[in-house]
């Protein structure tokens, strides 16, 4: 398992390599998705973000394209995938067909009961604007969610990616902030550092980098 120093150095190197992209992303988001325009220019919550806009043409166009892609590719109201086995002979078995249909139905139900549709829409907005998106899925958060799984479209400023020799993304590092309270909820009290433990009792809203 890679240690902290190795991971830190690799993230720093990836951050240097993507520096020129960050300027482009910031400019695009300023005009197309200002609510996410926190790549190079960091703003506080509630601060005005539309000072460079002439009108909402770019924002509207991005929303329409993202909605069209979602409705076509991952519609919340229409089936958009089915399941089959590699063995075609088994696929002809009626019992196997019924099992696969039931499994697909359970998956659809799970998607529609969670925040999948909200977060996948954010993913399409990112793809249509800056051309890169990361949809993260994990187990529901330790007693705080009842959905079983939880989705999160990561902000472009949070993560660093690298491709394999075949051009496929095989590495993703993420840097993000959590309050002390959120960190304890996410990792458990015994799994966070002493500073976070202390802050969770005295200053639960104080933020830490992870």
Write out the residue ranges for each language-model feature.
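Extended, helix-rich architectural segments
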Residues: 1-209
């Amino acid at each position: 398992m890679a240690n902290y120093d190795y991971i830190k150095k690799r993230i720093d190197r990836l951050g240097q390599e993507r520096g020129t992209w960050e300027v482009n992303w910031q400019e695009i988001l300023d005009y197309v998705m200002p609510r996410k325009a926190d790549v190079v220019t960091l703003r506080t919550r509630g601060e005005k973000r539309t000072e460079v806009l002439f009108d909402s043409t770019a924002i509207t166009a991005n929303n329409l394209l993202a909605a069209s892609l979602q409705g076509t590719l991952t519609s919340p109201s229409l089936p958009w995938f089915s399941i089959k086995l590699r063995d075609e002979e088994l696929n002809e078995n009626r019992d196997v067909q019924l099992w696969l249909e039931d499994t697909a139905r359970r998956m659809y139900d799970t998607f529609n009961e969670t925040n999948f549709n909200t977060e996948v829409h954010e993913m399409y907005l990112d793809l249509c604007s800056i051309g890169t998106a990361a949809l993260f899925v994990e187990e529901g958060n330790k007693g705080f969610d009842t959905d079983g799984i939880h989705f999160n479209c990561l902000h472009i400023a949070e993560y660093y990616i690298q491709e394999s020799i075949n051009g496929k993304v095989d590495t993703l590092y993420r840097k993000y902030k959590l309050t002390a309270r959120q960190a304890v909820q996410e990792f458990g009290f015994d799994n966070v550092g002493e500073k976070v433990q202390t802050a969770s009792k005295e200053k639960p809203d104080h933020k830490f980098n992870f």
